[in-house]
């Protein structure tokens, strides 16, 4: 089947993990307490605070206790949907104020633009909220890349390491899973996507491989497309050169 769409992870794939952990998370941790205090009465924020209480099992938690729970979740790198939503609100304010610019690897910018020009539909699947995803690409250091994407998916579609999530996403995209190529730097995510029927490509920007999947390393010693069993043809993604095959056979 022909590959018609690309579904990509963000952290470690299109963007540096360090941007998320060294820039975004600390920014949210610093600004989230005051943001929650100032906006707790607003409908959108109040709904997420209620979700924190429900998920933590502390139905009577006051605002300060909810803030403490959120900060604990940040420290634990917990993929809690209400936390991601609130972080997204904080980051949105930071992007609007010009304090944040989304990091996207220059090679990823090039590839995304070329893939779009070739008629491929591009989608994002990240543990970060859809709002946060849109901000990273829409307010990136390379400018507004938001128009390149046809849709975004987050943990509301399910955990990234469960195959049912990818089946659900394929259904939302409206394509057979075999016509979608998933890009990630996490082998468990690639496994789940493959189990759902998607094609997969692992990105190992620090070198190495992701067992069981075609892998693009930052310094390949030979044509990765040949090692992956694909025919000729490459599409440069900077130095790591991943290629989207015109046909999956």
From Swiss-Prot:
Q: How is the cofactor bound?
A: Binds 1 Mg(2+) ion per subunit.
CDD domains, alphabetized: HAD_EP
Superkingdom of the source species:
Bacteria
- Identify the pathway: Amino-acid biosynthesis; L-methionine biosynthesis via salvage pathway; L-methionine from S-methyl-5-thio-alpha-D-ribose 1-phosphate: step 3/6; Amino-acid biosynthesis; L-methionine biosynthesis via salvage pathway; L-methionine from S-methyl-5-thio-alpha-D-ribose 1-phosphate: step 4/6
Catalyses which reaction? 5-methylsulfanyl-2,3-dioxopentyl phosphate + H2O = 1,2-dihydroxy-5-(methylsulfanyl)pent-1-en-3-one + phosphate
One example of the protein's molecular function in GO is:
magnesium ion binding
Q: Which UniProt keywords apply?
A: Amino-acid biosynthesis, Hydrolase, Magnesium, Metal-binding, Methionine biosynthesis
- Which Gene3D superfamilies does the record match to this protein? 1.10.720.60, HAD superfamily/HAD-like
Cofactor(s) needed, names only, are: Mg(2+)
Q: List its EC numbers.
A: 3.1.3.77
UniProt signal peptide: none
Q: Report if keyword Metal-binding is assigned.
A: yes
Q: Which GO terms describe its biological process?
A: L-methionine salvage from methylthioadenosine
Family named by the database record: Belongs to the HAD-like hydrolase superfamily. MasA/MtnC family.
> What exactly does this protein do?
Bifunctional enzyme that catalyzes the enolization of 2,3-diketo-5-methylthiopentyl-1-phosphate (DK-MTP-1-P) into the intermediate 2-hydroxy-3-keto-5-methylthiopentenyl-1-phosphate (HK-MTPenyl-1-P), which is then dephosphorylated to form the acireductone 1,2-dihydroxy-3-keto-5-methylthiopentene (DHK-MTPene).
Quaternary structure per UniProt? Answer: Monomer.
Q: What protein am I looking at?
A: Enolase-phosphatase E1
Q: Give the gene symbol.
A: mtnC
């Amino acid at each position: 089947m022909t590959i018609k769409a690309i579904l990509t992870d963000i952290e470690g794939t299109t963007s540096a993990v360090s941007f998320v952990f060294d820039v975004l998370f600390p920014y949210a941790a610093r600004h989230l307490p005051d943001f929650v205090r100032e906006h707790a009465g607003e409908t959108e924020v109040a709904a997420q605070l209620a979700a924190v209480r429900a998920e933590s099992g502390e139905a009577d938690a006051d605002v300060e206790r909810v803030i403490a729970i959120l900060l604990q979740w940040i420290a634990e790198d917990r993929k809690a949907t209400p936390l991601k939503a609130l972080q997204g609100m904080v980051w949105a304010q930071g992007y609007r104020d010009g304090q944040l610019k989304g990091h996207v690897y220059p090679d990823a910018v090039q590839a995304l633009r070329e893939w779009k020009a070739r008629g491929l539909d591009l989608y994002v699947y990240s543990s970060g909220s859809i709002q946060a995803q849109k901000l990273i690409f829409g307010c990136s250091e390379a400018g507004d890349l938001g128009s390149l994407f046809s849709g975004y998916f987050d943990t509301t579609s399910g955990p990234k390491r469960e195959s049912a999530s990818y089946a659900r996403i394929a259904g939302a995209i409206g394509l057979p899973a075999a016509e979608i190529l998933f890009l990630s730097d996490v082998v468990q995510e690639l496994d789940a996507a493959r189990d759902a029927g998607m094609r997969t490509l692992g990105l190992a920007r620090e070198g190495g491989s992701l067992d069981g999947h075609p892998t693009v390393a930052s310094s390949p010693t030979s044509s990765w497309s040949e090692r992956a069993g694909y025919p000729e043809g490459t599409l440069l993604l900077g130095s790591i050169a991943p290629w989207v095959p015109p046909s999956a056979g």
